[in-house]
Amino acid sequence: MPTDISEKELETILVSYLRDHQGYEEGTSSDYDKEFGLDTERVKRFILSTQKEKVKNTACFASPTEERKFFSRFSAALSKRGVTDVLRKGFKYISEIFDMYYPTPSALNPTAQQYYDKNIFCVTRQLYYSKEKTDSIDVYISLNGLPIMTMELKNHYTGQTVENAIKQYKEDRDPKADPTALILQKRRCAVHFAVDDDDIMMCTELKGNASWFLPFNKGVNGGAGNPVSPNGVRTAYLWEDVLGKRSLSDILENYAQITFKEKEVKNKKTGKKEKKTIESIIWPRYHQLDCVRQLLKATREGGVGQKFLIQHSAGSGKSNSITWLAYQLVGLLDGTTPILDTVIVVTDRVNLDTQIRDNINSFKRLSNLVDWADSSQTLKDALQDGKKIIITIVHKFPYILEAIGSELKNKHFGIIIDEAHSSQNGSLSAKMNIALSGNVAKNEDDLEDKLNAIIEGRKMVKNANYYAFTATPKPKTLQMFGTPCPQPDGKVQHLPFHEYTMKQAIEEGFIMDVLKNYTTYASFYKVIKTVNGDPEFDQKEAQKKIRAYVESRPETIRQKAAIIVNHFHTAVLDKGKIGGQARAMVVTSSILRAISFYYEIEALLKERKSPYRAIVAFSGSKEWNGKQVTEADINGFPSKDIEENMGEDPYRILVVADKFQTGYDQPLLHSMYVDKELSDVAAVQTLSRLNRCHPLKRDTFVLDFYNDTDKIQKSFQRFYKTTILSDEADPNKLNDQTDEIEKYNIYTEEEVRDLNTKYWNGVEREQLDPIINKSVERFKLLDENSQIKCKSSIKGFLRYYPFIAAVTPYCSKEWEMLNTYYMLLVHKLPKLKGEDFTDGLEECIDLDQLQVTKMSERKIELENKDTEVDPMPMGTGKGGKKEPEMAKLSDILEQFNDIHWQNIEAVKVQIDSLPNRLQADQNFVNAAKNSNKETAQKQGFTSMMGIVIKMMSESTEFCRQYLDNKNFQNAINERVFQQVYSKISQGL
């Protein structure tokens, strides 16, 4: 007989493995009681085998009538509290609390093992679950009779996939359409899986077509899917690993949960705000489960003194991963001794405190486990009160610990760092390490002993483990927390311990691809001279100043604001994006521009009688029309209400200046309008505000007035897959810096030692100033060029030394003394302003003509590869003073206008004809069809040059602009290439 490749056979493989290898019982559909929505016989068997005294005291099974009363109340408890809560906390009936599950035992407790073995894991095929329908669910898993999981299986060989299983859940397993199907109702079953032979998706709450299925795949090659399994189908890990008894118990005890969050929402009828409880049913995704388990295993095996870097994409559920890790780290034991005394979560998100506390309290009745510390006293109190998890803000943490000092050196800590790239600047991490290690040098008499204590304290401490989470690791973060990987050439790369890449998150549909619809606009300006004379200015600085001048002009902002408002209404709101709920963000380069944009957008919204309004967001206050204003003054409501109000009408457009560009989680955000330079981490973090998913969100949109697509592509590529540090930082760069500084003879070796002796012995401040002031006076005698080089090198040393001290064993007492000396000296050195050779420029010019024109509309493609980054750079102090390049204003403006002014409207006909001309070029068509995009682009640009030269007789003006202006040429080439290449790629 040929091999059975049916869906039924896949079902057989799964069920038989659980039965024969994982110790499950195999049940039948008749075991399931449709009236109560559970396996009443197994519930009864479990209780009778473990809690006979409670059964006797309550007479719950004394008669069919009593039994019915018991199961009626039991079923009601499942509906109200949820299956995971009933399993964890038991079920109260009359005078007794019935345990419904016995947790995983420790190795030291044989009695607990006996109880655990009484748990009944059961798998059932073809469960007929409804009183009204004859439908059956392919696979059903229960624990002690309680529903844990359902599965719909599909099979590629019979032409169906996981998508068909999802469709079946959405259309045929709608709980509202069949109220008698209790297993489909909210909270009654922990999770529902759609499974085929390649992929797994999961859903914790069925809502018909609104059901949200998340991936439960391992990932392959940094992307979606599952790797090839040598012994079976790709998804066999589900029944061979995840559904093993110990594994499933672990998930139910430590991960699965129902969380509740109170939120104020506006009543649409009354207009008043009302409190609403948002309920979330959570089951871990595979990467979260795998990450936390690997970290726990490494901690259990390696003890303290380790460091781990977790590179998880934005929007990948880091908050839950951190919560699950923190909760379980405090429970790890070495024999009977806790491996870690306290876990400290360092974050820049205040709301993480509430989230972790709520999540942990959903696991067990532990009201005193978590606390928040915002001062040294609250930290002391938390430690003395036995708090096991303490949350604090990144900037307060080192100073809090510094106050505790040597009291901590005998404690073992787990330090979980949320968004590690932003929390490990040199001085903060150094203070953290010194405090945790207890090496504060307070009781040492000799300077050398003090310095040795401080140097030792700067290193990554041995009485703590570091768990650093970030989506965008910088070189410093990779070296501090990454896993060292020596290479054959002698270099030492550093890699993440665990990763969930941006590529995988996008491919799995968990976050949106924010580069899919990326439109660039170019601003073309013509600036004229308004004075009779022809004054001279620094040519290079003048070009920057003129650009800033025209960008901040009211007419420039007005034209861009008009594009924003028109696009948001016609292309976003009118098209019903996110079910008509779409929001937008406008990213500006300064507070003044943000305020200008806000008022222009508000005026344009009123002009078109739009029902919607804008909000402006910035920190502090700014002078506007002669008075100081804050965001609250302009918006008319407190700053704390901005996030909440952006989720409620009439507010739809958020205008920001260095605010809400990180950490802002609003799934309704659909469009972003960028009028600010973005690069590297800032580009990824800012644009990633759009990537949060929503059941009705199908796409996102970016309109960029400032950045070209190549720059954005490079920024995202760095973090698309694994980010690898190419080599470790070189401590010898510190010697290069000190060599440069000491050329200027602003201090002596004796002065450095004298100051350190006094400083570390805590003398009166007056004894330090005379020493430092000598160096200041010598510095003032240097020429301006030497001052710039010297001060730059001092700052470079101060940036680099704390980092090197933390990650290498090569630090010296001389470096530590110089660090102290420079730290005090740099604050007293005079500011080096330099002469402004553009002073008065703005009074001599005016904006004559302005055009803001769409240049390209494309998807920015990222390459399927890891990215190596170089070690942390350090300034060399070799810059010195730059001599101004003086030029006449007329020449400066001619150069500026050559670069920035093209009369697009005058050559629009020629520009519009280019796509058809390029599509008719056979050399380009062949390259587009038969080679990669990069090769096709090179040929496209070559073909464009030939096409334009042939157009010389048609329009000399267009050809002159194209051939003479490289910026214009590149913009036209990019625009036309993307348009035509996209058509050819799609076979159009």
Description of each model-found segment:
Residues 361-402:
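Inter-Walker segment of RecA-like/P-loop motor cores
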Residues 2-342, 351, 355-366, 395, ...:
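ATP-dependent helicase/translocase motor core
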Residues 689-718:
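Conserved segment of the helicase C-terminal RecA-like domain
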Residues 229-232, 476-581, 598, 602:
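Interdomain helical connector at the RecA1-RecA2 junction of SF1/SF2 helicase-like NTPases
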Residues 425-514:
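Post-DEXD/H (motif II) to motif III coupling segment of the RecA-like Helicase ATP-binding lobe
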Residues 44-69, 270-274, 306, 332-334, ...:
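Catalytic cores and motor modules of nucleic-acid processing enzymes
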Residues 387-419, 423-434, 442-456, 635-643, ...:
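Conserved RecA-like ASCE ATPase "motif II neighborhood" in helicase/translocase motors
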